[in-house]
Amino acid sequence: DNWMDSRIARFETRTYDWDALKFQADFDPKYARAQCRYMGTGGTGISNDENVVPAEHFTFSTMVLPSGCEGPPHIHVDVEEVFFMLKGSIRLTIEKGNDFFETILKERDLASVPPGYYRGLYNIGQEEALMLVMLGNKKPVTPHYPPDHPLSKIKRSKK
């Protein structure tokens, strides 16, 4: 292994991890989506993936969102989260206190969500959507859900 190899993550060596957020899909299939990690392990709670470029300042992954998929509202207390749409369209919701924002992200659109805001998404298209997800810390704190959301009651195992 040389230094260059340790800094490159090739698509051909990635796998779509449908289990990264499986506890959500087990609760309701509408939450089924796949993470493909490139740099760091992201904010899904996965920590044992050694097939990534080590994160130094942020994480970088893609998410495959089937048609009708919903990403439940969640909050990152420690990091900015950036979404960049590669394919498809999603409805993005952002909420903090009494402030509520909603927009449609299409191909090549970017949204930045600061720490401390709830964010959720829904694939409004008839085909799968693909988006880049970046979190602004090499080891983000696992996000949590609004207290009244059913997923907030589920205990998930560490991976």
What are these regions (language model features)?
Residues 1-57, 149, 156-159:
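A short, N-terminal "cap"/entry segment at the start of jelly-roll beta-barrel domains
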Residues 40-49, 59-77, 115:
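Conserved short histidine dyad/triad with adjacent acidic residue
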Residues 67, 78-91, 96:
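Glycine- and acidic-residue-biased ligand/ion/polar-headgroup-sensing regions
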